[in-house]
Amino acid sequence: MTDLEYVEHCLHIPDPQERYARFRDDPRLRAILPEVYALDGVPQPPAYHPEGDVLAHTLLAVFHLPGGCGRRLAWAALLHDVGKALTTREVAGRIRSFGHDRKGADLARAALERLGMEEAPVEDVVWLIASHMFALSWQIENLDRISRRQWRLIADPRFPILLDLAEVDALAAGGNPKKMAQVELYRKARLRLDIGV
């Protein structure tokens, strides 16, 4: 089994607790994915991340993956915050990780190419990671306030996977009701596009 196959096997362990424990404890995974385990001890703002450091958040994202999810979502959940290891700073007494989405996309590309993943899924995972902060930046309360630019993102064929990533990300941070409501609003927006209303 190649390293890529091994990680994918672990990402698709049906029991979420077993999957979580594997990623927490397996030395082979630590050797294969130094980008992920560099997140150990990287702080996050407790008000938004009561679960702890970035590695704890990442392991919970892996835990919350829905059964039978596709490889793009699984890899995006695993790698979505790897950029925080390089971007996290204290700014004016607050923990910030400006640009972690873009830096994380670059790190994810390098890791996935190193592991030998095909180009198309690499591009999709990179796009998901680069785009995963959209929900935080939009803060839209009703569909009539969505801009043309935002509708273009919603129309992207990968957007439903991005919504699944946003949900997994929110669940890994304690399932904040406001974040979950945002995900549902964006699902309604996508449905509106899909049915042409």
Predicted regions and their residues:
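Exposed alpha-helical structural elements
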Residues: 5-6, 18-22, 28-31, 35, ...
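Divalent metal-dependent catalytic cores for phosphoryl transfer on phosphate-bearing substrates
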Residues: 63-175
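Terminal helices and disordered tails flanking the catalytic cores of nucleotide-processing hydrolases
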Residues: 139, 172-197
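Residues that form generic nucleotide/phosphate-binding pockets
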Residues: 9-10, 22-26, 35, 64, ...
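Acidic/His-rich, divalent-metal-binding segments that scaffold phosphate/diphosphate chemistry
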Residues: 1-91
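Charged/polar, low-hydrophobicity segments characteristic of intrinsically disordered regions
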Residues: 4-12, 141-145, 196-197
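A generic short alpha-helical patch detector that favors 3-5-residue windows
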Residues: 28-31, 53, 100, 154, ...
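Alpha-helix boundary/interfacial micro-motifs
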Residues: 31-32, 44, 93, 97-98, ...
